């Protein structure tokens, strides 16, 4: 019998359905889902608005090349216009975050006629060849070298390191909050300096918002926390409300230099994807999801800090909006397993961080549940550390 390749460690439970911020396993156990498909389900599982738009579109046409116009794309553009990144009036739709990063890197090389890309230590931008080339973790990169280069990795949140960005740099790619790297928010001084340096040497600034974008951090786009504007922005995950969609946003001065055949995607911008983005935009506006993420994120961080303040192995609780990391002084795997046993799903970030990526629908009661489970997980981690 054919078998699925396993690139992920099996979590040992079979999920059969989801709704809102919860999922259920085959034994009908209910879980608070703060894994959320690596953050995809920010608008909640089985969001009714998303489902209704997808059902309607499936009854009309589900696949169509971007060579042909169709009404749902026109509606999507109208709904997205209010939420688009400032001055980035052009977009191309793809299917995954890695694909969006690939296109952003291609555009940077074409526009600048330069080759070098600058990225940052602890970054994660994807696992396809180009995206992997600007991803820091050597475990991901080394088996597939040589990759695309030259790429130079600088210290994140270190203004002095930006001196390495010179006139041979095509682009700098950066996450406003490093997700896989440990849920590390960028410092405002760092981001503003980065924008100044890239402008000085005419290098493009690519902001990777595949995980941070579409409201999760308390703004529709996380770069808006830093009073700067990017040259290119990549988006994904939440923008499709659970449907696989990603996007690259560009300003007019770049789009004018893009030519037929520079890129393409068989499924990119298909009618179902356009319907999903249309619906997601409606939810984002009607539910004020960014404002909810900001308020709920602040409350969740406060509850976590109160519940975990007496643990010596907790190094830091950090994050932005509903992108939260609990950084330990030890491996968090035991705590993540205990959380799952307590019916709270989370994921690891970096070497020592528990990552929470809940849907915006999370309630204070959910936060208390998660915080109590986290306390139990860290307590067990601490006990086993002492015993060993």
Swiss-Prot record:
One of its GO terms (cellular component) is cytoplasm. Gene3D superfamilies: Aspartate Aminotransferase, domain 1, Type I PLP-dependent aspartate aminotransferase-like (Major domain). Its EC number is 2.6.1.118, 2.6.1.124. It catalyses: [amino-group carrier protein]-C-terminal-gamma-(L-lysyl)-L-glutamate + 2-oxoglutarate = [amino-group carrier protein]-C-terminal-N-(1-carboxy-5-oxopentan-1-yl)-L-glutamine + L-glutamate; [amino-group carrier protein]-C-terminal-gamma-(L-ornithyl)-L-glutamate + 2-oxoglutarate = [amino-group carrier protein]-C-terminal-gamma-(L-glutamyl-5-semialdehyde)-L-glutamate + L-glutamate. Pyridoxal 5'-phosphate binds at residues 124, 208-211, 266. GO terms for biological process: arginine biosynthetic process via ornithine; L-arginine biosynthetic process; lysine biosynthetic process via aminoadipic acid. InterPro entries: AcOrn/SuccOrn_fam, Aminotrans_3, Aminotrans_3_PPA_site, Class-III_PLP-dep_AT, Class-III_PLP-Dep_Atrans_LysJ, LysJ, PyrdxlP-dep_Trfase, PyrdxlP-dep_Trfase_major. The keyword Kinase does not apply. Homodimer. Belongs to the class-III pyridoxal-phosphate-dependent aminotransferase family. LysJ subfamily. This is [LysW]-aminoadipate semialdehyde/glutamate semialdehyde transaminase.
